[in-house]
Curated annotation (Swiss-Prot):
Protein known as: Disintegrin cereberin
Region (Disordered): 51-72
Claim: Calcium is one of the keywords in the record: no
SUPFAM superfamilies per UniProt: Blood coagulation inhibitor (disintegrin) (SSF57552)
Short sequence motif named Cell attachment site, residue ranges: 51-53
InterPro entries for the chain: Disintegrin_CS (IPR018358), Disintegrin_dom (IPR001762), Disintegrin_dom_sf (IPR036436)
Positions of disulphide bridges: C6-C21, C8-C16, C15-C38, C29-C35, C34-C59, C47-C66
Keyword Disulfide bond listed: yes
GO molecular function: toxin activity
Compartments where located: Secreted
């Protein structure tokens, strides 16, 4: 939702302050296929295996999201 950096629904998430819905100090992310222990996974790590003619999807190192890498 607007103003939230992370989903504050679960107080058990070590990356997110449940009271403020903001990332804890030093955290880059709270969840996502390219987020591990509150940090972005390094560039090039496979986050989703290839299907059909599409190549493996890989983390960018700049986001917790796993981008879709598709042939055009």
């Amino acid at each position: 939702e607007a103003g939230e950096e992370c989903d504050c629904g679960s107080p058990a998430n070590p990356c997110c302050d449940a009271a403020t819905c903001k990332l804890r100090p030093g955290a880059q992310c709270a969840e996502g296929l390219c987020c591990d222990q509150c940090r972005f996974i390094k560039k090039g790590k496979i986050c989703r295996r290839a299907r059909g003619d599409n190549p493996d999807d890989r983390c960018t190192g700049q986001s917790a999201d796993c981008p879709r890498n598709r042939f055009h």
